[in-house]
Amino acid sequence: MQNPVFTSTPVTAASQDTSYNYGLAATDPSGGTVTFSLISAPAGATLTGNTINWAPTAAESRISNSFTAKATSSSGGSATQSWTVTPTGTVTVNWVNTDWTPSGAVQIPGPPIFVPSALVPQPDGSLELLSGTAASPGVYNIGQVPGGYYWLIQGTGPGSPLPPTGFWTNSSTFDLGRDSVGAQTGLLSAPEDTTFDFNLSGLDPSSTPGIVAFITDNPPFAPISFTPQPGVTTLSASAIVSSMFDWANVNTAFLVQYEPVSLSSLNNLVLGPELTLSNLALTSGTTNTISGTLAPSPQASVDLSIPGSKWASLFQNVAPGTVTPTGSWLSIAPEPYVIGVNAKPQLFAPPFGSHVYMVQPDSPSGLTYPGSACPSQPFFLPVAVDPPILADQNFGTLQYGDPFPSDWMRVLAFCQSVTTPFQVGSLTFPIALNYGMTVSPSSPSLAPLAGPVVDPTIDGSNLFTTTSVNSTVAKLNWSAPAGTSPYGYTVYVYQVIPRPSGFELLVAGNYSTAQTSMTLPPLTAGNTYLFVIITEVDGIANMQASPYRSQLPTGFATVMSAQVTISAGTAGPQLRGDPKELKRFLHPEGKRYRITAGHE
């Protein structure tokens, strides 16, 4: 008796929902007949005669599926053949935002023309961009994605040169949605001047003038602020606002009075009297009268103890040069209507707008701070900041008004900023970097949650040393920081463009990963780049599946590289795909930060 010998080669290529067929063949050296059986296989695979039939499902695609077939000869001999098949599959991207409004959570599908894509590394070193299609409102499919990791590229408009925002993932489902405050804001065809006449009473007759503000629940609308006279309880004033935002979209607004309170080096504005205006019917391009009586706010308090020494230790080994701490920020704010999650800014919303703070730094401008607290993006600094806190300090108890519904999310934000010198030619410029966190005011431990990455390198060279690399496909490596485990890291890539009196930083791409290394999509030979690596901590965010869904606590920390030049003449890998979409990688036109000698 001799064992049969397989003469067929397994078929290893397959695709989701497509028929897979493999015809088994074997010979019996003894001259007998051979029959076949299927010992192990994915669910749904069948053997008819000598042919294996299978239609990979979504759950079976993009993962390895094991097969074992057995050949048995008529004389009793047997042999087995084993192989694996990883079918290409469909990646499903859900882009449905949750907008929290006075009437509840509203599901808003992402822009239908902003179709995501997948940039897939190939075995030969090339990269292929696979375009997605819209399956239904807020749902997109990217077909024929092989198993393993790929870059999920967030969509923009067709042919847009905006730089890529990418996530390194192996997931077959991906959620690009986010939670945000307020209904969507409509746009007018052209800017219009809208007048507001305010007739208010119920102010706290403070001897130290604070700020009275009209703040909407739609973040893109900037607050309207006034400084009342000392000792008065009423305010009559007018304001003209020129804007393309349609005021008819504003349902709710808050009339608030902020009053200055200092705790040692923390100079705060805290919420005093307040009035919520609901079911507004505002009209753009005309005069709107706003009248009402503010009422005293119920009091809340927070004990502030800040371990400044732990923050100071963050600022070591984060940039090529020595950093200089420049300021700190502390705020407490509700997230209107938001329950159980943490809101993110609306997609494509401007960086400045309305935010209803209950505590914020005192503003020397006499205006409320028109922006989000503690931006993690590089180079943004809060407009109004307190001195940096570098030693452990107990500031005592801070009282503030909190008149808002108890089920709304409340967020305490604390961050510190530093600057580091950046040299272009013979000129040196300060570059700002931020470090921050958000927690619940009910348990405000203000020790930093996120630490900067450790020992970052590019192609094996120290990232803090000016260098040239001989590859357009740069590989970044770093070690994870101590402390709370991050859910991932984001690398901001900037092209450095010298100008006669300064330089520009052109955003060339934003790439995120849950790992401690990253092979970037191709850069351009001859260009000089700057890399900023952000460590990110979040209660629920998942960098490989749902990076924008958030829950407290959150934290971030920053590292900035030296200048890295891609050697001129360096050949890059082949890029395949729609030329219009590849433009985002080859010739990106992102936001430009222009820094000149007159604006240090």
Located regions from the model:
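Surface-exposed or secretory-pathway low-complexity segments enriched in glycine-proline
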Residues: F6-N53, Q81-P87
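Beta-strand-rich modules
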Residues: L523-N542
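Extracellular fibronectin type III
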Residues: G539-P573
